[in-house]
Amino acid sequence: DVYAFGVGALPQMTVPTRIGGRDGGDSHGMVGIGGKYLWSGDRHLNLIDVYDTGNGNIKVGTITLAGDVSNDPAPDLMDASPDGSYVFVALRGPNPLTGDNKEVHNAVGSTPGVGVIKVDGGGRSGKLVSIAPISRMAEEKDKDGNMVKKEKADPHGIQVRKK
């Protein structure tokens, strides 16, 4: 679920209000775009929901990430470029180290790395345009005791360095 709350009177805060989410979703990783939009990633459904923070936090769109660049990107944490024209997102791997519900595999992705999303409409929409792949192959025994190589890369954190 996605919640909004005021921080104008810190250290006191207002009671959080639910502004979005969905059954079967996994809201995970958020980034503010241009001071107007909030992007909330959903690892399990490969989506980013877009909320207009200047207009009552209403949901104004959904960005579908699965497609030509990756069939199962599993977006995690995100951060925007200094000029807000791109968002960089950690994409989970096929063998997540943490946060995976084994019944639904909500944290499993097919393309571990850093996704590059081109921001459109001032932050109202975007498109996954490329991935900088990350790989860490490791040998381990399969269920029959045979040695096999498995992808173990599982990025799930990111921060854009602003100079």
Predicted regions and their residues:
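Predominantly soluble domains enriched in secretory-pathway, periplasmic, or organellar proteins
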Residues: 1-163
